[in-house]
A protein has these predicted regions:
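Phosphate-end processing signature that detects enzymes handling 5′-triphosphorylated RNA
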Residues: 1-178
Length: 178
């Protein structure tokens, strides 16, 4: 979406029952082995900093059904944002053979996330508006996206909720992952 979509989204969401709303800064670094072992397995590994808390997350291969992305993920609280160890990685997922090389940072994302937890129909839907940047070496790319997560309830409620969005252009659905 375009950056001016934030105000439109915020105004639109005010017509629904908002259970929670907050803005946080998220710093993420994504890691893989030099041979791209994790990417070849359709997995992603990141360290996320949220305030003073750090979480190691492994996202495994998922599925896309009707445009809805479902991807299992495993989390581990860690003390800092240093390069994840083999021990940490194997505590998240039962890998059979990991490369002997050290994990290396691939890229980072820094963004502000404003999220709303909305009661809609028989469901709870999280709406997140992310605005920031992707960093890889000397290159940067802006991030400006809206994400929806069905926290509880019916997939049909999620699709109905999204169909009510006030955007007619500059918006597209994607199951792409960072």
């Amino acid at each position: 979406v375009t950056s001016d979509a934030f105000d439109t989204l915020k105004t639109h969401l005010n017509q629904f029952k908002i259970l929670e709303q907050n803005t946080i800064f998220l710093g993420n670094t994504y890691f893989d082995y030099p041979d791209h072992f994790l990417a070849k397995q359709k997995m992603g590994l990141r360290v996320r900093q949220e305030n003073n808390d750090f979480t190691l997350t492994l996202k495994t291969d998922g599925k896309v059904v009707g445009g809805l992305h479902s991807r299992p993920e495993y989390n581990l609280s860690i003390p800092d944002n240093s390069v994840p160890t083999t021990e940490q990685l194997t505590s998240l997922y039962p890998f059979e053979n990991l490369p002997s090389a050290t994990l290396q940072p691939i890229f980072s994302t820094d963004f502000n996330r404003t999220f709303w937890l909305i009661s809609f129909g028989a469901s709870k839907i999280e709406v997140a508006f992310d605005q920031g940047k992707i960093l890889s070496g000397e290159k940067t790319q802006p991030i400006c996206e809206i994400e929806f997560e069905l926290k509880e309830g019916l997939v049909s409620d999620l699709f109905h909720f999204v169909s009510l969005l006030p955007f007619e252009q500059d918006v597209y659905f994607s199951s792409a992952s960072k």
